[in-house]
Amino acid sequence: KVEFYDQNHRIYLQKGADVKGFRDPESKTIFIRDSLAEPLREMVVYHELHHAVQTNPDNDKVGINQESNIGRLIMEAQTQYFAEMVYSEIHGISFEEREIPTENLRMINNGTVVSSLHNYEMYDAMLSKLAIILGVPKSYFVSINFLYKNNEGLKDLESKYNDKKQECELPYSFQVLLLILDYIY
């Protein structure tokens, strides 16, 4: 079930104005803020549907973000990437990359993030850099996000990185690299 809500709804009052969509596993309802403009509104529906199908039924946690917050950036970026790819295929369009000032993304001022996404742009920039380092397409991140049992998706990603680290003599551990990619824009 998909339900659109306004600023008087309990979801808005509990979660605030920054939340565009919310998946409630108990009621099996996806809540979407009704004031979102298109195409973002439709994309948020696909985004939340994707979260619903990547949820571990044993613990209601989503994607590779099972044991800690390490996978959150990757999970949200690849979920938005998936949602926008679905939207693009349905409507037969593609989105151009944009340069977005970091102050528009609740980041430190005077930077620029490059992304074609309409949400989670700063995470998408990190995902793009990680894809280049690993030599994988962004669709790889979508595929590992369903490997949530025993953190297999995150382990697979870290293993790929460790292989590349040894091959290219990279100086950083996987977690330090994620931190660097998150803060360098």
Q: Each PLM stretch: what is its role?
A:
Residues 65-115:
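Post-HExxH zinc-binding segment in Zn-dependent metallohydrolases
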Residues 40-44, 69:
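A generic hydrophobic-helix recognition signal that picks specific residues
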Residues 1-30, 34-38:
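Auxiliary, metal-adjacent structural segments of Zn-dependent hydrolase domains
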Residues 105-185:
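Pan-zinc metallopeptidase signature
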Residues 15-18, 67-68, 178:
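Low-complexity, repetitive regions of proteins mediating host interaction that are extracellular
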Residues 43-60, 76, 80, 84:
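Active-site recognition of the HExxH zinc-binding catalytic motif
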Residues 38, 72-76, 120-123:
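Active-site-proximal structural scaffolding
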Residues 42, 55-64, 87-96, 138-140:
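Short, solvent-exposed secondary-structure capping/transition elements
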